[in-house]
Amino acid sequence: MLSPTNPATPWILAIALVALIVVMVIRASRKDKREYRRFKMLRTTKRRQAMFRRWVLQSFALFGGVSVVLLFLDAQFVPLLLAEVRTVEWIASPITQLILAGVLVVGAIVAVGGIIAARSETEIPSIGDVQALLPRNRAELRWGAALSINAGLVEELLFRLAFPAAIFGITANAIVAIAASIVIFGLLHLYQGVPGIVGSMLLGAVFMAIYLISGSILLAIVIHAFFDLRSLVLIPIVLFKVHLVRQGNGLAPKRPTAAVPAVVKPVDVAEATPTPEAP
């Protein structure tokens, strides 16, 4: 664990952070995009479930592992960054806390109620190229839930704790640390296209605000997981009734979906290449 008073600490953090970011951005710009294109060609649920399972395991290992390594190095900067931000009086005020609570409650009601109200709609707006991620039968729903919960956990630990703390340890600037972490979070959604990148940055800003105002990373994890569960579980169940489909060939639902799952996927392109297979 690096000490904030050690003059070598910023340099060590900078080397570690730059190396990690370069690797992750290269993966996102090359492997993620190519694999996602191939994933969209898969038609059998067996292959889709295998890919979902691989994404869950790889994401947990990669992003969870990076979080552990970075937090081991920069853990002492986590409370320092939070304390710096909360010196802004309105951020830590009880009134802001109440407003946040109200916004979260109303947001949850609108998120769920909007899906229920849209059951009869013929078209649901979407942000980013995310339709292929929708579960298409009961078995795939389980992987949708696993992806959502895993993303909520490892992505919040990485992009709301580990990365901002490391950047703060390098720059001693809370604004730079927060803004850079949000941008990195968005860029790692390259496979969703420009709309997906922008949408992910906006979501990252929301999750960051929840963490900074509440002071609780657990709350940010829960909200992130809830949002992804809405996209990858609730929408397929309510709009497409996929929970009633025991078997399936993996064909896409007839109607487009809504929402941007905030899921970053580590990938293995070679294993994702589809081959002809009977449904």
Regions found by a protein language model. Give the residues of each.
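Transmembrane helix-loop-helix hairpins at the membrane interface
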Residues: I124-P279
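Glycine- and small hydrophobic-enriched segments that form the cores of compact globular domains
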Residues: V85-I91, I115-P135
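Transmembrane alpha-helix/helix-exit interface in multi-pass inner-membrane proteins
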Residues: G102-P125, E156-F163
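Residue-level signature of transmembrane alpha-helical entry/exit and packing/kink sites
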Residues: P10-A14, M51, W55, S59, ...
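Hydrophobic alpha-helical transmembrane segments and immediately flanking/interface helices
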Residues: Q76-L100, F163-V183
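C-terminal halves and exits of single transmembrane alpha-helices
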Residues: V85-I109, A139-N150, E155
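N-terminal, membrane-interfacial amphipathic/helix-forming hydrophobic leader that caps
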Residues: M1-I95, I235-P279
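Alpha-helical transmembrane segments of multipass membrane proteins
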Residues: A19-V22, L62, V66, L70, ...
